[in-house]
């Protein structure tokens, strides 16, 4: 999702149009990550938390594809496990309500 966001900003296109054009039945896994802004461009560096516009793209992907394996990529400037875990759990907000509550209960146990 971050790759789509970064490309949409650098090449000026609507990221939701891109997501809507992907054949949902072909999606096996979704990757989310943060990025870094360098002057006029954004680089997919996987070294920051996921920003709200990327979560919005993720939300649309989940709406189209349903519950899909999701990987949080964080490859540099890695914070504590607790912070990475909190960031990964944000993905549950975008699951259908019943699935989200079930997953949150399992994680809390």
Locate the predicted segments by residue:
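Conserved active-site loop/cleft motifs that coordinate metal ions or position small ligands
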Residues: 69-75
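Catalytic core of soluble alpha/beta enzymes
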Residues: 31-42, 61, 74, 81-85
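Acidic/histidine-rich catalytic cores of soluble enzymes
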Residues: 1-41
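A short, acidic, amphipathic alpha-helical segment used as a generic capping/interface helix at domain edges
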Residues: 14-21, 49-64
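Short, well-ordered coil/turn segments that N-cap beta-strands
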Residues: 26-28, 65-68
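C-terminal helical cap(s) of enzyme catalytic domains, especially alpha/beta-barrels
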Residues: 81-104
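Short, glycine/charged-rich beta-strand-loop motifs at protein surfaces that mediate ligand recognition
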Residues: 43-49
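Extended recognition/assembly regions associated with phosphoester-bond processing machinery
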Residues: 77-82, 107-109
